[in-house]
């Protein structure tokens, strides 16, 4: 999927072009960025293997659970994993590729993680796709990010639905393209009763936004006389947060790729007792081995939730 934090690559510097140039370039590239460039095909062996069929694999969450790797213990698996998918832009820049090649490679990485979550019994996977802070990016970049997201939903959601995956989108939808909103509504409706894995994609989201919209919702309920001010507590706030779409709203484990050591305004309320794991790999390079390493680290920790074990 898309990257949370993508530096503008020097191989395609948006600031160098005038508005007309950007529009022409977008019209020429809007279809091509949704496919791998020839140079990407040459370079993808670094991640997928030149002759590997991995880049053509669809999102799945296999019907049967795969035996866990011997390093992991089923009783210690997290119920909810959240991921900040960072590094698509740098991955592309390092290989002399176009920015959309990095984002498309990021989609391939997400496919693998979704499949592993389904096989290994993880019940919720939340990924940070587009932050409210990302709206300051050049319009052309935002447009192709949303086009990639829309195309991915259209082409993959039937595979996910077939494999009993529920898809939920959280975040401020007021600025999203109408065509994307239609796809989101359809995908959520078709998959709403699926139970094997819930994939939550945060788009136009930030932790601050989530708390703010929750407070506004509570304020409206007070104004309408539904509740008294004295009734406001943590439980009520949690009911208004956008993660109320899942039975397990609090991530057990947060993974951030690319070596950055921060949570970047993601799920600020929900991460209160979450275990954090920072991976050095850029997101397109993050796969099975990195995921196992993160899960092993999680399983070795003692979670006290503010208490003390005797």
From Swiss-Prot:
EC number: 2.5.1.-
A single BP term in Gene Ontology: protein glycosylation
Domain of life, per lineage: Eukaryota
GO cellular component labels: chloroplast; chloroplast stroma
Keyword Transferase applies: yes
Pathway: Protein modification; protein glycosylation
Keywords linked to the UniProt accession: Transferase
Gene Ontology molecular-function annotations: prenyltransferase activity
Gene3D superfamilies linked to this entry: Decaprenyl diphosphate synthase-like
Cofactor(s) the protein needs: Mg(2+)
Function: Catalyzes cis-prenyl chain elongation to produce the polyprenyl backbone of dolichol, a glycosyl carrier-lipid required for the biosynthesis of several classes of glycoprotein.
PANTHER family documented for this protein: DEHYDRODOLICHYL DIPHOSPHATE SYNTHASE 2, DEHYDRODOLICHYL DIPHOSPHATE SYNTHASE FAMILY MEMBER
Family: Belongs to the UPP synthase family.
NCBIfam families xref list: uppS
Record protein name field: Dehydrodolichyl diphosphate synthase 2
Organism this protein belongs to: Arabidopsis thaliana (Mouse-ear cress)
């Amino acid at each position: 999927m898309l990257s949370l934090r993508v530096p503008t690559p020097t191989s395609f510097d948006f600031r160098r072009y005038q508005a007309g140039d950007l529009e022409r370039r977008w019209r020429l590239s809007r279809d091509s960025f949704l496919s791998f460039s020839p140079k990407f095909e040459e370079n993808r062996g670094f991640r997928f293997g030149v002759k590997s069929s991995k880049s053509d694999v669809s999102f799945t969450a296999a019907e049967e659970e795969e035996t866990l790797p011997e390093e992991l213990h089923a009783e210690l698996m997290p119920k909810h994993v959240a991921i900040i998918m960072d590094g698509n832009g740098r991955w592309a820049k390092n290989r002399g590729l176009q920015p959309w090649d990095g984002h498309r490679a990021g989609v391939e990485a997400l496919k693998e993680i979704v499949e592993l979550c389904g096989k290994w019994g993880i019940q919720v996977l939340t990924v940070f796709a587009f932050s409210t802070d990302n709206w300051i990016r050049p319009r052309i970049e935002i447009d192709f990010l949303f086009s990639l997201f829309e195309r991915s939903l259209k082409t993959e959601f039937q595979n996910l639905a077939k494999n009993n995956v529920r898809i939920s989108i959280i975040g401020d939808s007021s600025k999203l393209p109408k065509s994307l909103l239609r796809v989101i509504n359809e995908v959520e409706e078709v998959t709403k009763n699926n139970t094997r894995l819930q994939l939550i994609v945060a788009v136009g989201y930030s932790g601050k936004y989530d708390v703010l919209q929750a407070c506004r919702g509570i304020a409206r309920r007070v104004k309408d006389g539904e509740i008294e001010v004295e009734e406001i507590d943590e439980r009520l706030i949690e009911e208004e947060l956008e993660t109320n779409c899942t039975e397990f709203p609090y991530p057990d484990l947060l993974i951030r790729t690319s070596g950055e050591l921060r949570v970047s305004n993601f799920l600020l309320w929900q991460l209160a007792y979450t275990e954090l794991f920072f991976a050095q790999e850029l997101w397109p390079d993050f796969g099975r081995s990195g995921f196992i390493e993160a899960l092993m680290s999680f399983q070795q920790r003692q979670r006290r939730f503010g208490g003390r074990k005797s």
